[in-house]
């Protein structure tokens, strides 16, 4: 066995491991390895010793026991200058670098046909033990858990076998983050199957989520609040386009409120399968329009509420065209524009407004294919967790409850306004006509007052409510909302239904000759 310092390599993700191993040998390391990693290295003629040959103890129990041996953990945990004598007495050589990533538990449990046995057999034991041992002894040992760190480790080594204390500490923290994430996934998976049948429940006994800080923010919702932006990194699903995956192409750093509002705008525009534009202010849509012509979609959305759109967030569900980008910056002050991608020339056009932040998020999934993520709401001393509201309604789901039948055009507008209402803070009322918003009433304690505000907004923008449709995110508790709609000329209404007074609201709609449909689905948003 070479007296060169040792590096132990045992990885499930074998990306670039051969090149990394070759670099370690060039830096002066001798290599130990196990199982599949050992076989891969030997196939590429990399000089490496199998761990079982080093320990004199064979792998056993179908690979369950490979590295759990004093010669391995003593070599990792031994304190240089303190434990040298006992290491020498037991022929334990120093292991100065540990390169380990863990069994693919996340990928295993993401399979639709995963069994409990599959999951159990993909719970790594030896790997986390080595990772934690090396991270604990980071004063003397380097630990690498991420293939993305291979290059910087080789660059830091140069022609030596010593990493700086700063780098070892950073890698150790990353290693503990790695094992915490791993154990959290295991606890979530097993904790949601504590019933007799071991069938998955919606929520596990304990809730673990790993978040990674991507940005320190200047301040929070208000200047006296400190803040940072974290993103989830323990999702077993492929990450669909979101504010967390978006890339900023231009403009100054995003603020706390920018991120929150951009999320609201992007999630709303995702609800549309046809080309759409959404303008958001203070997390509420203030203008939404669907149009194959992106410039027309923007101008129409803007015209719903020009005052509120000032300094707003604009989201598109199609690539941002040069014409639309130019129309925006020539027309208004905007904080953020986000789209799946941008066409050539867009950044040159928006560069004239250096404070405009331009983000791309990647292709958006069809509304019916969106991943159902979890929503969190912090309460004092706890966390409310629920499934994301991705409930979809089609024309076939509508229950017509009035004598007057809605026309095909009205049904299209009802479904459009229903999509918008889902993203307006409750109590939410949306007036729409011709696949565009006419007025939005948001966040009122009284539903009828939200309806009044929607009408006021429409009048203020010079938009006619006569013949428009109305969407309500929850049922009308009294007929006053219907009477108010009739006063401004609303022709059709969409609402969940389910009130004790549904008969009264249906009667009111019939009195006024208004078509009304029930969805059977509520969309409170707080």
Swiss-Prot record:
Pfam families: AICARFT_IMPCHas, MGS
CC annotations in GO: cytosol
Coiled coil: none
Alphabetized SMART domains for the sequence: AICARFT_IMPCHas, MGS
Transferase listed as a keyword: yes
Documented EC number(s): 2.1.2.3, 3.5.4.10
HAMAP family: PurH
Name of this chain's protein: Bifunctional purine biosynthesis protein PurH
